[in-house]
Regions:
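Active-site-adjacent structural elements that line small-molecule/cofactor binding pockets in enzymes
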Residues: 1-254
Length: 254
């Protein structure tokens, strides 16, 4: 597949955007759209490390009406912390507000085990729980009537209407072997981070091989942390500081 014409570029939501007036928020987002950026990107955490976080779907809902030229990318949504019926309804509602503009990235998190514990979720089950929820959400967003998996979710005859038109791409994030398998089995693509171009290309091959029987319209992405400085060392220092502050890990761990 020739992907040379499929490239899109997004930018993370400005950290101070919520503190600005609606007029200033619109001005900044308009400047992003004027620059040719395709989408705005936001993360998702319930209570990360010191209690900080943001509900990614709520933030994108707020942004959706401020600049209609920009698509909306959630990366990544901690699905294991939500019930799949509720998550599917929220995704469907946002897709109705911004048809054709929403992409939802799904991840398992885990950098902060306490975030899962305070939500009543065993961190050790987050991968299997995400797999179960992702399979259910995909069927729900296709308009199917589903039953819970019997291990994590116990319900019958769940359904979400109306279904999003067009369908919402569900992209799976992560670097592990399990993440690549999850992307191939359940996703419409893979969202990579902290990997080389070679590793990115290899990961895409693995994902598409696993998902060959489904043959979706693959949409892969690579998340980059970029530091703008006076030179390479200054730019690297800015990135390393921000990543260490956010993840509470030494930069070299990445």
């Amino acid at each position: 597949m020739d992907r040379s014409t499929d490239l899109q570029v997004g930018i993370s939501t400005p950290w101070d955007l919520p503190s600005l007036s609606p007029t200033e928020q619109r001005r900044r987002l308009a400047a992003v759209a004027d620059a040719g950026i395709d989408h705005v990107f936001t993360a998702d955490h319930v209570s990360f490390h010191d209690g900080t976080g943001i509900d990614g779907l709520v933030r994108l809902a707020a942004l959706s009406g401020l600049e209609p030229r920009l698509d909306l990318y959630l990366g990544v949504y901690l699905l294991a912390l939500r019930h799949p019926m509720v998550a599917a309804r929220q995704i469907a509602t946002l897709a109705e507000l911004a048809p054709g503009r929403l992409t939802v990235g799904i991840g398992v998190g885990g950098e902060d085990r306490h975030e899962f514990e305070v939500c009543g979720v065993d961190p050790g089950t987050r991968g299997r729980r995400t797999n179960a929820a992702l399979a259910l959400i995909r069927d729900l967003l296709d308009g199917e009537t589903v039953a819970g998996d019997g291990e994590f979710y116990d319900f019958d005859e769940g359904r979400i209407l109306p279904t999003p038109k067009p369908a919402v791409p569900l992209i799976v994030g992560g670097r592990s072997k399990a993440a690549l398998e999850r992307a191939g089995r359940y996703g419409d693509g893979w969202l990579a981070a902290w990997c080389s171009p070679r590793r990115f290309a290899e990961g895409i091959e693995i994902v598409e091989s696993i998902g060959a029987d489904r043959a979706p319209d693959w949409r892969h992405g690579l998340q980059l942390w970029i530091g703008v400085g006076t030179d390479v060392d200054d730019g690297r220092a800015q990135v390393s500081r921000r990543m260490a502050e956010f993840y509470k890990l030494d930069f070299e761990a990445f």
